[in-house]
């Protein structure tokens, strides 16, 4: 069963300007260490950050709260499997919200997809509840 769906569109050029203006202050407020290492190794640094920004916004929407209701930016983190597939991790209040919205006898699975076509980065997040295996 679907528990939540969220999407977001981020402007890569806006993220690039924010990185230029605020640098580490912005990076450290929004992105985990793992996300920063990944982004800084990429040719398109701003695009990588923009996709993760969009993923966090989309996840907060799928959780039904948005970022205004206590979820911190770093409560959500995007990593990648070796195949390149993005994976959303939640901690803190985001994890608490996910647990609260998951029906008994189910486990929540967060699906995330990222794309970009300059100057836009987009993310979709679907939160699904799957029955626990006996």
Curated annotation (Swiss-Prot):
Q: Which GO terms describe its molecular function?
A: holo-[acyl-carrier-protein] synthase activity; magnesium ion binding
Any one Pfam family here would be ACPS
Annotated keywords: Cytoplasm, Fatty acid biosynthesis, Fatty acid metabolism, Lipid biosynthesis, Lipid metabolism, Magnesium, Metal-binding, Transferase
Q: What is its EC number?
A: 2.7.8.7
Carries keyword Lipid metabolism?
Answer: yes
Is NAD among the key words of this record?
no
Q: Which residues cross the membrane?
A: none
What reaction does this enzyme carry out catalytically? apo-[ACP] + CoA = holo-[ACP] + adenosine 3',5'-bisphosphate + H(+)
Give Gene Ontology CC terms.
cytoplasm
Compartments, as annotated in UniProt: Cytoplasm
Q: Give the protein's cofactors.
A: Mg(2+)
What does it do? Transfers the 4'-phosphopantetheine moiety from coenzyme A to a Ser of acyl-carrier-protein.
NCBIfam families recorded = acpS (TIGR00516), pantethn_trn (TIGR00556)
Name of the protein this chain belongs to: Holo-[acyl-carrier-protein] synthase
Look up and give the organism this protein is from.
Roseobacter denitrificans (strain ATCC 33942 / OCh 114)
């Amino acid at each position: 069963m679907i528990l939540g769906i969220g999407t977001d569109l981020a402007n890569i050029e806006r993220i690039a300007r924010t990185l230029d203006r605020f640098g580490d202050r912005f990076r450290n407020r929004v992105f985990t260490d793992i996300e920063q290492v990944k982004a800084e190794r990429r040719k398109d640094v701003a695009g990588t950050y923009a996709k993760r920004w969009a993923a966090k916004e989309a996840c907060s929407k799928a959780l039904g709260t948005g970022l205004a209701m206590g979820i911190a930016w770093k409560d959500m983190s995007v990593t990648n499997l070796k195949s390149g597939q993005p994976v959303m991790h939640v901690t803190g209040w985001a994890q608490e919200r996910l647990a609260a919205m998951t029906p008994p006898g189910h486990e929540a699975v967060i699906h995330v997809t990222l794309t970009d076509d300059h100057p836009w980065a987009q993310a979709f997040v679907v939160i699904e509840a799957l029955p626990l295996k006996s």
